[in-house]
Each structure stands twice: as structure tokens, then as C-alpha cells.
């Protein structure tokens, strides 16, 4: 069976037309700092938060709208994690559409956010982008949205 035939069979079997992207999870060392970053600086809402004492971790979900119709970010805080996480080279970034990348970067820089790639056009295309970092060093691409 070819890759195309396999993909078609899986779609027919699984009913992928009803699938939906729910969330992406990132591990954070300081949950309070991460919540402050994502809610106060990026304007997301804390949708839910729950401690799991037997597992010694907390899950907090943040996003721009209700989980029933929006993709959100799951922040996982492992209580015993003292050292920074190794972000490795496989994970790329999260991306946010913003109305004005330049203004957003000015506001975030004034709040002390790291901006490893300042606002400007992409080198090989017309989109205006920037990259910022959250408190754990995860990169977030800001993309100029219409």
C-alpha cells in the first residue's frame, strides 16, 4: 500500500473530518511567571488550572477563547523541576497573529521580554514577523495578520 493509499484508508477509518487540534503542551519551571507572561503580556485568559498532588504537577490552560472552539496552550509545571528544561533543537516555535508586529514588539520590549529577532520583513518573503521568548526560552513568532 502506498503512502497516499494508507492516508486515504486511515481518513476513511478514523473519520478525520471530525478531528480538531486541541492544545499544545510546554513544560514551565515557574508557573506564576509563565501565567503572567501569557495572560498579562500576551492577553490570553487563564481557562483552567488544576493541581495534581499525587503526581506533583500542575496543569494550566491559557488561550484567546474557550477550549471548545479554540486551540490553547497547556502549561505543565512539574513541582520538583529546579533546573531549566532542555528545549533541544527539534521544537521550533509557537506562532501568534498580531495586528501590528512593530507596536507589539515595542510594548513587549518595554516590559522586559527578550526579542531575539526584531520586527521586520522575512528575508525571503513579504510577511512582517518577529520572534520573542517566554520565561522558559520558548520562541514565539509574531506574524503580522491582516
Give the ranges of each region predicted by the language model.
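Vicinal oxygen chelate
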Residues: 1-17, 47-50, 58-61, 96, ...
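Short glycine-enriched loop/turn motifs at secondary-structure junctions
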Residues: 17-20, 86-91, 123-124
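Core segments of cupin and vicinal oxygen chelate
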Residues: 18-19, 25-70, 110
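Hydrophobic adenine-recognition pocket in adenosine-nucleotide-binding enzymes
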Residues: 24, 94
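Hydrophobic pocket-lining residues within nucleotide cofactor-binding pockets
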Residues: 31, 91, 101
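Short, charged/polar, Gly/Pro-enriched secondary-structure boundary elements
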Residues: 67-71, 137-140
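A cross-kingdom feature marking solvent-exposed beta-strand/loop segments within repeated
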Residues: 80-83
